[in-house]
Structure formats: C-alpha cells, structure tokens
Amino acid sequence: MQQFLHSMKHYAIFFAVIAALTYVLTLVLGADKVDLDKYSTVTITKGDTLWELSNKYHNHHHLTTNEFVKWVEDVNDLNSDTAQSLSPGDKLYIPVLKKELHNQVAIEQ
C-alpha cells in the first residue's frame, strides 16, 4: 500500500508539472499575438520602403524607425529580403491604430 501511495505521489507531481508548463507556454506564446483588427493597413505604392512608411506615419506611432520596421516585418511575416522587395499593391499592417488615422482624417476635413 505504501508503494502504491508513493507511486501516486509521483504521478501527481508529474501531472502538476505538465499543467504548470502548459500554463506558462500558453502565456508566453499568447503574449506575442497582435490583435490586427485594431491596426491600420497600407497599400504599397512604387518606391515605398518600410523606413519611409515609418517616417510618413511618425505622428501616429511611438516607435523608433527600427522598431517600426521590425514590427511590420514580424506581423506581416516578412524577412529582410522580402521587406526590401515590396511590390505596388501589397497590403501591410502597420503599428498605427485605426482610430489614430480616423481621427487625423476627421481633423483634416
């Protein structure tokens, strides 16, 4: 009987560790998710670069140019090569809240 209890104790510890790891992984992996519905999209025109987009929208975000570029690359699954070869018509999410651009348009009208 004592051996059975000892064995059950090991199973309980094992399952507690698995549950804790699952919880931590859920928090860590879920933290990187971005709610894209909140962010603006832009349509690339000829000659656009991520650096130019950062400068164009600098009044609407609080990132450095490098942070802006990194955010756009990460969220849009771009690497440095694909970021260099943007094509007119490509649509990209940018780290500018939709409400920020909406407010700007309302002010200008």
UniProtKB/Swiss-Prot annotation:
<comment type="function">
    <text>Inhibits cell division during the SOS response. Affects a later stage of the cell division protein assembly, after the assembly of the Z ring, by probably suppressing recruitment of FtsL and/or DivIC to the division machinery.</text>
</comment>
<keyword id="KW-0742">SOS response</keyword>
<dbReference type="InterPro" id="IPR018392">
    <property type="entry name" value="LysM_dom"/>
</dbReference>
<comment type="similarity">
    <text>Belongs to the YneA family.</text>
</comment>
<dbReference type="GO" id="GO:0000917">
    <property type="term" value="P:division septum assembly"/>
</dbReference>
<keyword id="KW-0234">DNA repair</keyword>
<dbReference type="InterPro" id="IPR022887">
    <property type="entry name" value="Cell_div_suppressor_YneA"/>
</dbReference>
<dbReference type="GO" id="GO:0006281">
    <property type="term" value="P:DNA repair"/>
</dbReference>
<keyword id="KW-0227">DNA damage</keyword>
<keyword id="KW-0131">Cell cycle</keyword>
<protein>
    <recommendedName>
        <fullName>Cell division suppressor protein YneA</fullName>
    </recommendedName>
</protein>
<dbReference type="GO" id="GO:0009432">
    <property type="term" value="P:SOS response"/>
</dbReference>
<dbReference type="InterPro" id="IPR036779">
    <property type="entry name" value="LysM_dom_sf"/>
</dbReference>
<keyword id="KW-0963">Cytoplasm</keyword>
<keyword id="KW-0132">Cell division</keyword>
<dbReference type="GO" id="GO:0051782">
    <property type="term" value="P:negative regulation of cell division"/>
</dbReference>
<keyword id="KW-0717">Septation</keyword>
<dbReference type="Pfam" id="PF01476">
    <property type="entry name" value="LysM"/>
</dbReference>
<feature type="domain" description="LysM">
    <location>
        <begin position="40"/>
        <end position="94"/>
    </location>
</feature>
<dbReference type="GO" id="GO:0005737">
    <property type="term" value="C:cytoplasm"/>
</dbReference>
